[in-house]
């Protein structure tokens, strides 16, 4: 079921969010200011923005240009909605690492709630194909990434891709073509520890089109990183070498 409110009052929006945001996907468009406190500090002045709130606690804020959001919070964040004097606030709190996203809404143009179910996401291609893409354009991982060797053999196995970040830190990358699990995180951690002990510093990242909640929690606990492979797939959707199928999506 999908519900839509056009030009809702702050009072209407508050009750709508409290009723729906824990079970449905929420999208809203309105005039807002944003404050972020955590690993850094940022402030976004009053402007019209698109805000997406997912059932798992994810919050994403977009402006009118670029693919990447200007602010976001990951799954597992705690969301609190308050109706204050002349504004509606949405606060997203992440406990570890400690981060806080505070959105102050002064006007809403529309607000939607929808039941969205998960579908199958199949990628016709291997980890090798994805690594090939990264080797062609290392910045798909991050700016300044320098790949050194693929299938790098160490005592604990074969690393999919080894390189250095822009600061010269050894960077270990493990690629998965499907949703990453706890086993994938454990595998990456073994590789990461080898390079940490060998070089005194290291980074390790798991690259996949999805990750389980338990695996993501373990990634954060072990101070590893997760890279959403969908960012990479976005750049190749017009390539004949790959087919991306999203099926079994249920619509009400």
UniProtKB/Swiss-Prot annotation:
It comes from Sulfurisphaera tokodaii (strain DSM 16993 / JCM 10545 / NBRC 100140 / 7). Gene3D superfamilies: 2.70.180.20, 3.40.1350.10. HAMAP family: NucS. It is found in: Cytoplasm. CDD domains: NucS-like. Belongs to the NucS endonuclease family. Cleaves both 3' and 5' ssDNA extremities of branched DNA structures. InterPro entries: Endonuclease_NucS, NucS_C, NucS_N, NucS_N_sf, tRNA_endonuc-like_dom_sf. GO terms for cellular component: cytoplasm. GO terms for molecular function: DNA binding; single-stranded DNA endodeoxyribonuclease activity. This is Endonuclease NucS. The keyword Cytoplasm applies. Keywords: Cytoplasm, DNA-binding, Endonuclease, Hydrolase, Nuclease. The keyword DNA-binding applies. Its EC number is 3.1.-.-.
């Amino acid at each position: 079921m999908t519900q839509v409110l056009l030009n809702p009052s702050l009072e209407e929006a508050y009750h709508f969010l409290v009723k729906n945001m824990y079970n449905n996907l929420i999208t809203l468009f309105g005039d807002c200011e944003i404050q972020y406190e955590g690993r850094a500090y940022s402030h976004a002045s009053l402007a019209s923005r698109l805000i997406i709130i997912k059932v798992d606690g994810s919050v994403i804020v977009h402006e009118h240009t670029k693919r990447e959001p200007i602010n976001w919070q990951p799954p597992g964040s705690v969301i609190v909605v308050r109706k204050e004097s002349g504004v509606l606030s949405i606060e997203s709190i992440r406990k570890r690492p400690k981060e806080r996203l505070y959105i102050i809404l002064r006007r809403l143009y529309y607000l939607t709630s929808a039941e969205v179910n998960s579908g199958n996401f199949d990628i016709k291609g291997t980890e090798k194909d994805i690594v090939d893409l990264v080797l062609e354009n290392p910045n798909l991982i991050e700016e300044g990434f320098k790949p050194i060797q693929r299938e790098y053999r160490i005592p604990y196995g074969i690393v999919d891709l080894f390189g250095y970040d822009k600061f010269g830190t050894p960077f270990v990358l493990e690629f998965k073509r499907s949703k990453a699990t706890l086993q994938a995180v454990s595998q990456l951690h073994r590789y990461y520890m080898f390079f940490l002990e060998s070089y005194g510093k290291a980074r390790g990242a798991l690259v996949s089109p999805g990750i389980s909640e338990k695996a993501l929690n373990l990634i954060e606990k072990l101070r590893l990183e997760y890279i959403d492979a969908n960012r990479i797939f976005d750049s190749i959707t017009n390539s004949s070498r790959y087919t991306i199928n999203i099926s079994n999506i249920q619509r009400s």
